[in-house]
């Protein structure tokens, strides 16, 4: 049976190593449902969703993380944004033919991974790593070694459960300021690598952890729900319209009679007529009606 989208944190009592396990199905389906992506693009977004959830769970503060793939390939952009409450959204842009069995480098071409961390309070941090690994997991492991000098392993699996897209992943990381033995970390990584896609996507988290680590002492913490949530709003659209030259806005109104702002993440449409624009320019709140 497919599990509810959740993230589980766990800790090895005898090693200075922490872990995370996440499975997503409903959240992934909501990200994909408003778009007709080729299967390889769906797979990349699934991997990005898992990776972003795992990375967001490493935050020690309120804020969000955006994990973005950019390049000159036929999929020139893929991005997932998530916050410390495990609220996720994402989108991809395709500008060319996608081979049926395209791998990551074929999709992105010459590109890189951008990780942007935005605390609710404090300065934003951005890290960039070249798309040198063969997988997203390998690229992100490289990011952790360069930016935080913390040995980190990611294990990401994608597939279908009951005919619907699903994905899951696990993260192992040496605890900051701890001296975990490399042999111990490698041992745990070797165990984790054996997880089968079907097991990860269909079994309860506690059973997965027992199958992998039944000879180790593991503390598992209360799970956190993962969900799709878009941050778009009529107010955000109004703020965006304020940044456009009046002439450009008036030209669209004259030609179309209204301005239709579409959210790529969730598919919502926000309509603004001439009266709405006048209210925006007068710093009043635009009328409430909204079309989905």
Curated annotation (Swiss-Prot):
- Its main localization is cytoplasm
Gene Ontology biological process terms, A to Z? protein refolding
What kind of modification does the protein receive after translation? Under oxidizing conditions two disulfide bonds are formed involving the reactive cysteines. Under reducing conditions zinc is bound to the reactive cysteines and the protein is inactive.
Please indicate if the UniProt record lists Manganese as a keyword: no
Q: Which domain of life is it from?
A: Bacteria
Q: Which UniProt keywords apply?
A: Chaperone, Cytoplasm, Disulfide bond, Redox-active center, Zinc
- Please list the GO terms describing molecular function: protein folding chaperone; unfolded protein binding
Q: List the disulfide bonds.
A: 230-232, 263-266
According to its record, what are the GO cellular component terms? cytoplasm
A Pfam family annotated for this chain is HSP33
CDD domains the UniProt entry points to: Hsp33
The entry's localization annotation reads:
Cytoplasm
* InterPro entries per UniProt: Heat_shock_Hsp33 (IPR000397), Heat_shock_Hsp33_C (IPR016154), Heat_shock_Hsp33_N (IPR016153), Hsp33_helix_hairpin_bin_dom_sf (IPR023212)
Q: Which PANTHER family match?
A: 33 KDA CHAPERONIN
**What is stated as this protein's family in its record?**
Belongs to the HSP33 family.
NCBIfam families, per database record = PRK00114.1
Its biological purpose is as follows: Redox regulated molecular chaperone. Protects both thermally unfolding and oxidatively damaged proteins from irreversible aggregation. Plays an important role in the bacterial defense system toward oxidative stress.
Q: Which HAMAP family match?
A: HslO
Record-given protein name: 33 kDa chaperonin
Source species of the chain: Shigella boydii serotype 4 (strain Sb227)
What gene name is given for the protein in this entry?
hslO
